Regions:
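S/T-rich, low-complexity, solvent-exposed segments of bacterial secretion/appendage proteins
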Residues: 1-385
């Protein structure tokens, strides 16, 4: 009878633990990193008819072997790779969208200003002495310069924003590396099959998921489940053997980002950190292109205006000053100083200015630049789909 009671008690105890495990699974179904657990049970071998051997073994009930986590290593690895690629694409796209907004006519009015400049020049060909039209011409010049300054300021803020975001993400990445090493220490001490071990393994996987979404990492595991983590591709050690090697980020003067570990360059090609680097490269390219375009526009329009004569017969003055998009400024001119005339007549220079309008004029080049930016955003959006 006592044997039957013992067998029954072991069964009740085992299934009570099993129900508790099921409850944990239900409660943590949406918890990041949590893996479904299963209680492993085995037959408990009872006593035999001899203290030296068990020729006639009696049943002994149920023994609890431990907790098993239901995980698929291949699926987890594939999920982390997919997550890294998705985060890179999404992060890059978010900054390219912001660049498109900064360059849009709704934000800076450059395209509207250029169109207005040529439209007013056309109107001045019919009425070159009209002071209202002359004032409108100068206002369009000021609008163009203001638009370039606005766009430059927006891009500067984006560069600062990306740099700040990268610094914050690197800090979080390094904090997670430190936390992962603490998990390693705990796993080496944990009893195999225990709830504590399962919880540590869950937290380990959660941290690896986070790290993989930020940068490419390659984990390997020892018999205790402790992880050695290396950077994907380069193989640089990040965590392992009681060592944690934090990464760092540096911004160049133009805003481009570079990463390093242990003082050596670290190439990151996936994850949100890669997306930030690609976004920073795009912003830097756009800032340089905006400066070049502003300078070229100013030189081209200045040369065209200086080729004419104003209402008093004086040579035309430059319309713009400044050497970059951020410093481009409309020159202080009066309506009488608009150089509408040239040697061919009182409206000759406005006719010449209008004739510039074509495939390579400032208006067309700006439209082409916006189209290229839109194509870059479209490509990034397709990658993010």
């Amino acid at each position: 009878m006592s044997d039957l009671l013992g067998i029954g008690y072991s069964g009740l105890k085992a299934y009570s633990r099993a129900l508790s495990t099921i409850g944990d699974n239900i409660a943590n179904a949406q918890t990041p990193g949590y893996a479904r657990r299963r209680l492993e049970m085995m037959e408990a071998v009872g006593g035999g008819n001899s203290i030296f051997y068990r020729g006639n073994t009696n049943p002994g009930g149920v023994d609890i072997r431990g907790i098993d986590r239901s995980v698929d290593g291949w699926l987890i690895e594939d999920s982390r790779i997919t997550s890294g690629d998705a985060e890179r694409s999404a992060t890059k796209l978010s900054w390219l969208d912001k660049v498109e907004g900064a360059l849009s006519d709704e934000t800076n009015g450059i395209k509207t200003g250029l169109t207005k400049l040529y439209t007013t020049a056309d109107q001045l060909t019919a009425d070159p002495s009209n002071r209202t039209l002359r004032a409108q011409f100068l206002q369009s010049v000021d609008d163009i310069a203001s638009g370039f300054r606005t766009a430059a300021g927006q891009l500067d803020k984006m560069g600062e924003g990306i740099e700040g975001a990268a610094a914050s993400e690197v800090d979080q990445f390094n904090a997670d590396l430190g936390a992962l090493e603490q998990i390693n220490i705990g796993l080496r001490k944990a009893r195999p099959g225990s709830t504590n071990e399962a919880s540590l393994l869950d937290e380990r996987d959660r941290l690896l998921d986070k790290l993989s979404s930020q940068a490419g990492v390659s984990p390997t595991f020892d018999n205790n489940g402790a992880v050695t983590l290396r950077a994907a591709g380069s193989g640089d050690l990040l965590v392992g053997g009681g060592v944690v090697n934090p990464i760092s980020v540096t911004a160049a003067p133009d805003g481009r980002l570079s990463y390093s570990v242990g003082g050596s360059p670290l190439a990151i090609s996936t994850g949100s950190l890669a997306g930030l680097a690609e976004g920073a490269n795009h912003v830097a390219d756009q800032r340089a292109a905006l400066d070049t375009m502003a300078t070229d526009f100013a030189n081209q329009l200045n040369a065209a205006h200086q080729a004419g004569a104003d209402a008093n017969g004086n040579p035309g003055q430059p319309l713009f000053t400044g050497t970059s998009a951020a410093t481009l400024t409309a020159a202080t001119l009066t309506p009488d100083q608009v150089a509408a005339a040239n040697a061919s007549g009182s409206n000759g220079n406005m006719l010449a200015l209008g004739a510039m309008r074509g495939a390579n004029d400032p208006e067309a080049r700006w439209s082409g630049h916006l189209a290229t930016q839109a194509q870059a955003v479209s490509s990034a959006r397709a990658q993010d789909a």
